[in-house]
Amino acid sequence: MTSLFFDHALLPEGWARDVRMVLHDGTIASIEQGAAPQAEDIRHPVALPGLANLHSHAFQRAMAGLTEVRGPAGDSFWTWRDLMYRFVDRMDPDDIAAIAAQAYVEMLESGFTRVGEFHYLHHAADGAPYANPAETSLAIMAAAAESGIGLTLLPVFYAWSGFGAQAPSAGQRR
């Protein structure tokens, strides 16, 4: 049993003061408003419901630092996108799962409890489908399950590359 005490907590009925929350095996067992703090309580100033990250591309977590500094004067979103596609060409489902698991743990540590994962890496680097068409989706789902974050998988399909009905680029065929 774990006992948490909050000076302020946002509960379903609104804000409350002096709230004790008792957890059993990670599940909320009871909530008491207007409580007095006890010696065994772990104290916190504020409690909020878990937040949802509504727009994630977890694999991009591994790119941190690669595009933080602008390059030549002609650098733009499109040059960033080209780098991203070159980067993902080196990833396999195991890489995707490992990177997503790291990103999801970092989200949990930051207060997110759910993630909407925009997932568009469906094929091998050469654009060929995996034997199991859901291979990379299963990797994302395994990462979410391993980390403990709630997942809404949002599969993405590229019919066109940019504007003007251009065929998808090599990176978009993944």
Provide a role label for each language-model segment.
Residues 7, 26, 44, 55, ...:
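Divalent metal-coordination and catalytic microenvironments
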Residues 95-106, 139:
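Short, acidic/polar
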Residues 31, 61-62:
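Residues that scaffold the ATP/ADP-binding catalytic core of kinase and kinase-like folds
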Residues 62-98, 124-133, 160-174:
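Active-site gating loops and adjacent loop-to-helix segments of metal-dependent hydrolytic enzymes
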Residues 106, 112-174:
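Histidine/acidic-residue-rich, glycine-tolerant segments that coordinate divalent metal ions
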Residues 7-10, 103, 107, 118:
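C-terminal helical cap
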Residues 49-61:
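Histidine-centered catalytic micro-motifs
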Residues 1-36, 46-47:
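N-terminal metal-binding scaffold of metallo-dependent hydrolase/deaminase domains
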